[in-house]
Swiss-Prot record:
PANTHER family given in the database record: RIBOSOME MATURATION FACTOR RIMP
Name of the protein this chain belongs to: Ribosome maturation factor RimP
S-S pairs: none
Region (Disordered): 189-208
Major subcellular location class: cytoplasm
Gene name for this UniProt entry: rimP
Known function: Required for maturation of 30S ribosomal subunits.
GO CC terms in record: cytosol
Alphabetical list of InterPro entries matching this protein: Ribosome_maturation_RimP, RimP_C, RimP_C_sf, RimP_N, RimP_N_sf
Record key words, sorted: Cytoplasm, Ribosome biogenesis
Subcellular location: Cytoplasm
GO BP annotations listed: ribosomal small subunit assembly; translation
Family in the record: Belongs to the RimP family.
């Protein structure tokens, strides 16, 4: 069953059931899916490799495979644009394992119901315990660790910090995506947040 952080609306969950196996067969994981309606309809898919480091070519491969599957299944009534992107540096946290993977980094979390008079929490992730997400909060100058049931969460994402940027770049360097010169230059310039996107027509975009 797809959780509400990956796919919030009923149509998103239906689409997730269709595209998740396609993405998995290519060796990737679905991070988030949203069908956005307005003047035009856009299907936004966020995917990643199990160990991170998804690139433009990966987005293109996912876009082509998903597009072919959706053409057959035809779950979307209106004409739409398909956008496939990486999660970006200040990525959403949609799976329980994400909170364990990014332990030690700052995050913002929202819950569906009020907890001790609040729904929004910001602090350092402290891993997981069973089905609970642990987060360190600053309360009157003291650090307090609380546990939030994963099923209570309505939204969660990393906060963009220098430490997070450097860690993501180190991972990309270790994966061979960045060479030594690129790594040093990017760290000094402190890049803006964003994710490479591959639209259905094959054009590249930058999401902010």
């Amino acid at each position: 069953m797809t959780n509400n952080l990956i796919a919030k609306a009923a149509i998103d969950r239906r689409l997730a059931e269709i595209v998740s196996p396609v993405i998995a067969d290519l060796g990737y994981e679905l991070v988030r899916i949203r069908l956005m309606s307005g003047k035009s309809t856009t299907l936004q898919i966020m995917a990643d490799k199990p160990d991170g480091g998804i690139e433009v070519d990966d987005c293109a491969a996912i876009s082509n495979a998903v597009s072919a599957t959706l053409d057959v299944e035809d779950p979307i009534l209106d004409a739409y644009t398909l956008e496939v992107s990486s999660p970006g540096i200040d990525r959403p946290l949609t799976r329980l394992k994400d909170f364990e993977m990014f332990e030690g980094y700052e995050a913002k979390i929202e819950t569906t119901e009020m907890i001790d008079g609040r729904r929004r929490f910001r602090g350092e992730l402290a891993g997981i315990e069973g089905n609970e997400v642990l987060i360190n909060l600053d309360q009157n100058g003291e650090t307090v660790t609380i546990g939030l049931e994963f099923d209570w969460l309505s939204d969660a994402k990393l906060v963009l910090t220098d430490d997070l940027i450097k860690e993501m770049l180190r991972q990309r360097k270790a994966a061979g995506v960045l060479n030594e010169d690129q790594f040093d230059e990017i760290v000094e310039e402190a890049p803006e947040t964003g994710a490479t996107t591959m639209a259905r027509d094959g054009s590249e975009e930058e999401t902010k």
